[in-house]
């Protein structure tokens, strides 16, 4: 076997020889194999550096979104860092009928993604308590003395000014939004109250407060804000794909000719207070109307709005139905029921010559009160004596006429228009009386089951009042349940059931109602939805800054990628040069005589083979 001699520029006395026997295997490969090995080496190098780049640039995107939301809820109960200059603040005053409450909210700098909303949370003080304050009476009490309104609301604003860092006052928006109490006032009195606020507040406080920041909002607006707040806390406005999240097809309002989009299913809201009942839910599909009159009514009940900061983007466009029914709250319904009971009994007694309910010994039997309980109704100086029979089914039957249902299609309470609900693909949260009726006494709040609720309500109604009192004294009911709750639990259970199933037409098999007092351990107010909607354009500034930073980051990223590719290219060139050099040596070796040898030794001429014998 021949030898290959390689000469290097080492000291003159250093010479060596290499035999193919001891060389790497690659010297015995053909050209095709060498090319394949080279390509594979280059591909492996490029793949390696691509993985490094992707992991370093996008590794955070692979984190579990559920864990992030859980972490956000945990940090949401921490005290707000008022020393952080990137934290922004906003203030909402809810001027209700019985009093006014101020809520201070805060949020970090927007992340620059135009698809995301502001991460607004309730501000918490050093003791981790929400920054909230309430005063009485309601602002409507100053209808005849509007000049005193600024003094009335001043304690609330001073309270907020103490918690919001002074350096942030001039950029902190203040919204004063008035609800039910102010709605019933004449427009002239409303205007006088608002003008006093707009005139005096800027003199004493540096908050961002313009003419549009003080107004009387409608029941429809209040319902929309409540719907926004609930769904924001539930994370339904985060348009990220998750396997276990329910989705719905949506025809974007104003783009009915376009193809439907698929996004997270939002939750509907049911709220039964003492005076009124309200329902709000998204209407994802384009609706049709039975008549032009119905269409005209629907315009006042459907709200179309864009929560996003870009009016040209449609992913945060929603069509929401909101209807409020005065007189359908739990206490107002009982009052209506008693009024009719009193009037009908007096009329029957007059016609039949009876004395039913006029004495304690001959009480009127009321199926909507617990068994054997005694109660009284007083009107116009007269007293009607009642005794409960605890008949839940009869109570429900008695209450059905109070729904004021009509035979017209797509209607609910009082014959009011109601768009179709996709019961198989929907979810509702029931608040206030929906929760109290299921939890305070029956202890079955949460996931609603009509059959279980009905049976529990029947058992409660049919239980003697003396036993119910004994259970109450032993503390077997919720801590905030009182004797008033125990007395009217039977009535309110039947009323809630009828409103939900007969009034709003939910089937008794419906499984997606959750009765709740809080969402993720937080009491969600409509004021959260109000500030989310009214500050929706604020992210534009941060988005522009993020785009500017992203441009520079892009060039840094390009430079980073370019350097890695340059290194890979240099590595490939060096590898190919070595291989080509070895190939050239091999070809030189093949052209040499097979029996010849190349010797390189110090100070000796090359040896020649012996001549022929």
From Swiss-Prot:
Glycosylation sites: 404, 407
GO biological process, one term: CTP metabolic process
Catalytic residues (positions): 222
GO annotations of cellular component type: autophagosome membrane; cytoplasmic vesicle; Golgi membrane; lysosomal membrane
EC numbers on record: 3.6.1.15, 3.6.1.6, 3.6.1.42
Catalyzed chemical reaction(s): a ribonucleoside 5'-triphosphate + H2O = a ribonucleoside 5'-diphosphate + phosphate + H(+); a ribonucleoside 5'-diphosphate + H2O = a ribonucleoside 5'-phosphate + phosphate + H(+); UDP + H2O = UMP + phosphate + H(+); UTP + H2O = UDP + phosphate + H(+)
Disulfide bonds: 368-395, 461-490
Pfam families listed in its UniProt record: GDA1_CD39
Segments on the Cytoplasmic side according to the record's topology features: 1-33, 581-613
Keywords: Calcium, Cytoplasmic vesicle, Disulfide bond, Glycoprotein, Golgi apparatus, Hydrolase, Lysosome, Magnesium, Membrane, Transmembrane, Transmembrane helix
Tissue expression per record: Ubiquitous.
Recorded GO MF terms: CDP phosphatase activity; CTPase activity; GDP phosphatase activity; nucleoside diphosphate phosphatase activity; ribonucleoside triphosphate phosphatase activity; UDP phosphatase activity
Obligatory cofactor(s): Ca(2+); Mg(2+)
TM helices/strands, residue ranges: 34-54, 560-580
Topology Lumenal: residue spans: 55-559
Organism: Mus musculus (Mouse)
Family statement: Belongs to the GDA1/CD39 NTPase family.
Protein name as catalogued: Ectonucleoside triphosphate diphosphohydrolase 4
Entries under InterPro entries matching the protein: GDA1_CD39_NTPase
